[in-house]
Design a protein with these regions (language model features):
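Pre-Walker A-like glycine/lysine-rich segment at the N-terminus of P-loop NTPase domains
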Residues: 1-50, 56-69, 76
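Residues immediately C-terminal
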Residues: 12, 329-330, 363
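Phosphate-coordinating catalytic segments in nucleotide- and nucleic-acid-processing enzymes
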Residues: 48-308, 312-317, 395, 407, ...
């Protein structure tokens, strides 16, 4: 899990530190910078995956625009001003992503290489990590000359020495247990063989913003798999879950949670092998036998949003760390509160970490602020226009007599307009 994120010089953010839990809810005025925080994290993820072209940024949910609009406009704009995102995981893995853009036509953001980048890899992941990194360095050696070539050769020799030690079960000391490297080039794609490691989860970070049209058109698939940021790929994903023995029971568990909807009875997903139908069957307890079942086209959009959220949180096939922008969209206020409570349980059970933004006060009532893994943040802008963040905590030893939704509406939490 990600423990801490620091952001500098990104859009409305001059400098900010964010300490995360497992489920994190952002509230704040329109334009306060909630989405800017999410986009800065997604930009770091794109840098970690070495995919900084605009088409890859958009696929992650980033509003890619001119470089001068990506940098903070709160100071004099210059190509020399870099965007910085520093990430620390709970296992103390840490990276700093320094990004620059030369503002030339058709150019893309570049990750500034730092000679003191550190990475820690432990246990059985060590050999896999070193083999992948060595293959990358040997390929890179074929494309460089001069001083860079000598640096790479020295790096390769050091890596080969570490790899020999790591393969030796009788070796004692650091190489067998924990490795720290100072590299001249990118190591992000090889950090943490496990998809659940902190920095691997940054690489996968997406900003989901499901759309009604994408959820209803089950034949549409997105650039990102298994689930696109607007909900693309949901039908195929359900088919995979339903047919894969390794994920037996996941669809049944999703179906059980969908009973938050009073009318809902059951869900049937056609097999990918035996059916050419791109639709699911939804049982409504109020429908007569003659009327049959609903499909995704005739169902209400709230059902589709819940189906997407529960699918996203219920399996290791989806990212470990992600955001959902406007999680309250299309949902009844009371349902929003129950949804957040359900997502907190699913996140804990399936190793997920999420940031949710909302404008619906009722959403907050699903949070248990006595649980340190569930956190509420108010996003605002100061007199200079800088985005600021404040965590709302339950006072120790004191039970709240007011619902969070009421505290939000009455202005006790902040995050409301002050100009009217």
């Amino acid at each position: 899990m990600i423990k801490e994120i620091q952001i500098e010089n990104f859009k409305s953010i001059k400098k900010m530190k964010l300490e995360l839990g497992r489920i994190n809810v952002f509230i704040g005025e329109n334009g306060s910078g909630k989405s800017n925080i999410l986009e800065a994290i997604a930009l770091a993820g794109a840098a970690a995956a070495e995919k900084l072209d605009n088409e890859f940024l958009a696929a992650r949910g980033i509003r890619a625009t001119e470089p001068r609009h990506m940098r903070s406009a709160l100071q004099t704009a210059s190509a020399e001003n870099k965007i910085v995102v520093a990430v620390k995981a709970r296992d103390e893995e840490a990276f700093e992503f320094d990004l620059r853009h030369d503002e030339k036509p058709y150019s893309s953001w570049k990750l500034e290489r730092k000679t003191d980048t550190k990475i820690s890899v432990e246990g059985e992941q060590l050999v896999v990590f070193l083999e992948a990194l060595l293959a990358n360095r040997r390929t890179a050696l074929e494309r460089v000359t001069g001083e860079n070539s000598e640096l790479l050769r020295a790096e390769i020799r050091e890596l080969e020495s570490y790899l020999d030690d790591a393969r030796n079960p009788n070796i004692e000391g650091d190489p067998a247990n924990k490795l720290q490297l100072r590299m001249t080039g990118p190591v992000f794609p090889y950090s943490g063989s496990s998809r659940r490691s902190g920095l691997a989860s940054i690489r996968e970070f997406l900003i989901y913003s499901p759309e009604n049209s994408s959820l209803r058109m089950f034949q549409r698939e997105g650039q990102i798999e298994p689930l696109g940021i607007n909900g693309e790929g949901l039908f195929k994903f359900l088919q995979v879950l339903d047919s894969d023995q390794q994920h037996a029971g996941v669809v049944k568990n999703i179906s059980m949670r969908l009973r938050l909807l009073d009318w809902y009875v059951d869900l049937q997903v056609p097999s990918a092998d035996t059916s050419h139908t791109n639709s699911i069957e939804i049982s409504d307890r109020y429908l007569s036998v003659e009327s049959g079942t609903l499909n995704q086209v005739s169902s209400n959009e709230g059902f589709l949003f819940l189906l997407f959220y529960f699918s996203l949180f219920s399996t290791q096939l989806t990212p470990a760390f992600f955001a959902i922008d406007n999680v309250d969209a299309s949902l009844n206020p009371k349902l929003c509160a129950h949804l957040v409570s359900e997502l907190a349980t699913l996140a804990r059970d399936n190793g997920k970490q999420a940031i949710l933004t909302t404008h619906n006060p009722a959403t907050l009532d699903g949070l248990d602020l006595n649980d340190d893994d569930q956190r509420l943040f108010v996003i605002s802008r100061n007199e200079e226009g800088e985005t600021r963040i404040k965590r709302i905590q339950q006072k120790e030893g004191r039970a709240s007599t007011m619902k969070l939704s009421a505290a939000f509406i009455d202005g006790y939490l902040g995050g409301l307009p002050k100009n009217f």
